[in-house]
UniProtKB/Swiss-Prot annotation:
Gene transcribed to yield this protein: argC
Protein family membership: Belongs to the NAGSA dehydrogenase family. Type 1 subfamily.
SUPFAM superfamilies documented for this protein: Glyceraldehyde-3-phosphate dehydrogenase-like, C-terminal domain (SSF55347), NAD(P)-binding Rossmann-fold domains (SSF51735)
Any one of the GO CC terms: cytoplasm
Function, as annotated: Catalyzes the NADPH-dependent reduction of N-acetyl-5-glutamyl phosphate to yield N-acetyl-L-glutamate 5-semialdehyde.
Protein name: N-acetyl-gamma-glutamyl-phosphate reductase
Length: 343
């Protein structure tokens, strides 16, 4: 059995990691680490685990990391890198769910997140977008799990970028996310009365995920590009729906476009291409799937891509487990074949 330690286990992503790992036939959770809930049983903080998991949250201790084969760091950016360094020095497989190890360009990271204490480790890390960077993930020491918005956007755009089917500076990404994307920490802006029956844009022209999306899209396209990204907050708990627009470099009809996407993602279980309808949040909620729908606007020669994910699963915990499966040479689907709840 693979022994897994989760650092930052009491947040939304940490709890989702625990829930999913309990279903994994090859994993034993060896420790759950949370300074805010230290010495408290998870049965008390999260009663849904009663009779299922009898573990107590612990404060960080290097001995807990030593016991593990894989370490998941579900901590905020800037904080996470300290724990990643400890696990890396111990030779553990490290999967970091913050932004600290997603970038290759230190300048991009520093502009949005500040100084990086261990920039040399960026060369030891891979970007954990499994369907695109699988080979790099296999050989890296650290996996930087992608952000939720970037996962939806990049996978929606990848076939267009790799095949140079769109003008590089024509991309507009309009994304809507559930409130869980903001994390568990109390914030008035995300309280019930502020969010319920409301819908708003935020981080307009300055959201930090823009640089992450641009770096990876530039890599796929083969040259630097700029794009527009605007996130919005939906009055729902979870899920991301991205509507992506770009101008074609040549005319394509919808059937041709669908075939390009189906061929590009031919061997990817977690990518579902819609042919006769469009994705909706309820079809991906609770799953590790990415649902992609396509339309062609002939009068403007633009492609419209709809890309849907569950922000806590494919956008975080599920993709982290998919990365773990890759690192340990397991079938990527292991523990992640889940039908969405729908209602």
């Amino acid at each position: 059995m693979i022994k897994a330690s989760i650092i930052g286990a009491s947040g939304y992503v940490g709890i989702e990691l625990i829930r999913l790992l309990l279903k994994h036939p090859e994993v034993e959770i060896s420790s759950i680490i949370s300074s805010s809930n230290k010495d408290i049983s998870i049965e008390n903080t999260n009663p849904q685990f009663k009779k299922i998991l009898n573990l107590t949250f612990k404060e960080f201790d290097i001995d807990l990391v030593k016991e593990a084969d894989v370490v998941f760091c579900a901590l905020p950016h800037g904080v996470s890198q300290e724990y990643v360094k400890v696990a890396y020095d111990l030779g553990k497989v490290v999967i970091d769910l913050s932004s600290d190890f997603r970038y290759k360009d230190l300048t991009r990271y520093s502009k949005d997140y500040g100084n990086h204490k261990y920039p040399e480790l960026l060369n030891e890390s891979s970007y954990g977008l499994c369907e695109i960077f699988r080979e790099e993930i296999k050989s890296s020491k650290i996996v930087g799990n992608p952000g939720c918005y970037p996962t939806s956007a990049i996978l929606g755009l990848a076939p267009l970028l790799k095949n140079k089917l769109i003008q590089k500076d024509s991309i507009i990404i309009d994304s809507k996310s559930g409130v869980s994307g903001a994390g568990k920490k109390a914030d008035f802006a995300y309280s019930f009365c502020e969010v319920d029956e409301n819908f708003k844009a935020y981080g307009v022209a300055k959201h930090r995920h823009t640089s992450e999306i641009e770096e990876k899209c530039s890599f796929l396209f083969g040259e630097d590009l700029n794009l527009s990204f605007t996130p919005h907050l939906l009055p729902v708990k979870r899920g991301i729906l991205s509507t992506i627009y770009a101008t074609f470099t040549k005319s394509l009809n919808k059937n041709e476009l669908i075939e390009i996407y189906k061929e590009f993602y031919r061997d990817e279980f977690f990518i579902r291409i819609y042919e006769d309808s469009l994705p909706e949040l309820k079809y991906v909620t609770g799953t590790n799937f990415v649902d992609i729908g396509l339309e062609v606007d002939k009068k403007t020669n633009r492609v419209i891509v709809i890309s849907c994910i569950d922000n806590l699963i494919k956008g975080a915990a599920g993709q982290a487990i998919q990365n773990m499966n890759i690192k340990f040479s397991l079938n990527e689907k292991t523990g992640l074949v889940i039908v969405g709840e729908y209602f």
